[in-house]
């Protein structure tokens, strides 16, 4: 998932998004502006729907190797990650591969679209950018099948964001590969049409609808109709939103957390899933104990 702030029109007008309710001043205090929450402000715990927060590592271990690469997934497995997220695209000849971007430009230095290339053509361009890229000279864009096999080797749960699967054959291939996972996969997507299609095809696992606006009653009704959970951008969710989702039987996934304090805030708020990136700080070992 790439975090890019894009101005959007909220579905319903309302207060500015916040991760915690605004503190109501008492007669003895002077009203103060709303501030970014800290672990000290959020004191009341709210449990996740299943009783435990699950942590999803974003695009593999990006501190060890380039994002969405086999070395990054293998490093995640060796570090004990339980859930690992990646992005899925269909090539021009119908093979499902792992890549966040629609082009090879950023990771491989080749300005060509994945959807217009064959799988064999894509494999001609190694990944040359990202963490420690020079240490992996033969690092290629993985196939979805390779990613699933890696998750199976390390007992990780696949978390798959569908970026682009254009054909019926591609969707059938996706369903087949999901069935090869030893763990129950989680599938996420911005497009509710794609998620509803998976339900039509018989996928009974967890589906998450990615949203970049505040939660609304209409959104909740759509989720209940197709048995979807919500994957919310961190800046557009509050503790009351999470409570409301839980009351409607919906789970909330938060993206994207890049430090321990932010992760701790949303854990206390009752988030069911937290999508995070590893960070190179001394607190990383402390955080690993909560995964």
Residue ranges of model-derived segments:
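Phosphate-group recognition and catalysis centered on beta-loop-alpha active-site segments
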Residues: 2-291
């Amino acid at each position: 998932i790439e975090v890019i702030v894009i101005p959007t029109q909220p579905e319903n007008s309302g207060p500015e998004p916040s991760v915690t309710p605004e503190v109501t001043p008492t007669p003895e205090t002077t009203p103060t502006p709303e501030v970014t929450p800290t672990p000290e402000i959020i004191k009341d715990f709210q449990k996740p729907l299943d009783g435990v927060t699950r942590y999803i590592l974003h695009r593999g271990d990006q501190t060890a190797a380039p994002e969405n690469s086999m070395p990054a997934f293998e490093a995640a497995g060796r570090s004990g990650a339980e859930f690992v997220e990646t992005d899925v695209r269909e090539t021009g000849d119908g093979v499902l591969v792992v890549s966040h971007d629609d082009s090879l430009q950023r990771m491989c230095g080749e300005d060509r679209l994945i959807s217009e290339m064959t799988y064999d053509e894509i494999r001609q361009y190694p990944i040359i950018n990202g963490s420690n890229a020079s240490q992996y000279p033969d690092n290629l864009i993985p196939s979805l099948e390779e990613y699933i096999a890696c998750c199976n080797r390390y007992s990780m749960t696949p978390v798959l964001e569908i970026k682009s699967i254009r054909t019926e054959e591609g969707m059938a291939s996706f369903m087949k590969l999901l069935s090869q996972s030893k763990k129950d996969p989680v599938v996420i997507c911005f497009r509710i049409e794609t998620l509803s299609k998976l339900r039509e095809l018989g996928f009974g696992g967890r589906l998450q609808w990615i949203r970049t606006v505040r939660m609304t009653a209409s959104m909740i009704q759509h989720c209940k109709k197709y048995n979807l959970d919500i994957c919310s951008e961190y800046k557009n969710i509050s503790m009351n939103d999470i409570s409301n989702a839980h009351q409607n039987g919906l789970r909330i996934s938060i993206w994207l957390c890049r430090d321990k304090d932010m992760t701790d805030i949303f854990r206390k708020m009752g988030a069911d899933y937290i999508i995070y990136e590893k960070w190179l700080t001394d607190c990383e070992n402390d955080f690993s104990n909560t995964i």
